Amino acid sequence: MLTLLLLGFAIITPLIDFNESHATNPLWTGHARFHLVWQVNAMIITALLSIVLLWFFNSITNHLIVILLNYLWIFSFYATVFGLKLFDGELNDINGVPPVFINILGREYEIDSNIQAITGSLVVISYASVLFLSNLYLT
């Protein structure tokens, strides 16, 4: 389960971010694009390192390190979301990835794609963590 999440961080994130809606977005300054590419490269390296730790150097300690490393990405995303007003940030740009619309009990809600993806990642890593930790205490 963690491996699938990590593959998503290593493969899907660059597919989303290394295109005209992000890294080559003509509306972004070069410096903003630099920071995005830096962030995505760090996420790819973290994911690949995590996969190596899980599959080739598997231990309880390394498993916990992988969980913590990847929670860092998720929690830093939410910290940034909560701090958007501090730096006049936006979750999305005019020519960015469009939001998702869901219907709950007849009412339509707009959910930013970033929030949706990271919340899904949070659910997966939390579930995987609970399974891993409960397995530690049951054996």
Protein language model annotation of sequence segments:
Residues 1-6, 58-73:
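Interfacial segments of alpha-helical transmembrane regions
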Residues 11-17, 75-91:
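C-terminal TM-helix exit segments that contain a strictly Trp-centered aromatic cap at the helix terminus
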Residues 12-37:
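Interfacial loop at the N-terminal end of multi-pass membrane proteins
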Residues 25-34, 87-108:
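Interfacial non-cytosolic loop connecting adjacent transmembrane helices
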Residues 33-54, 71, 75:
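Core segments of alpha-helical transmembrane spans in multipass integral membrane proteins
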Residues 42-50, 118-127:
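Core segments of transmembrane alpha-helices
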Residues 103-123:
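Individual transmembrane alpha-helices with interfacial aromatic-anchor signatures
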Residues 129-139:
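Juxtamembrane boundary at the C-terminal end of a transmembrane helix
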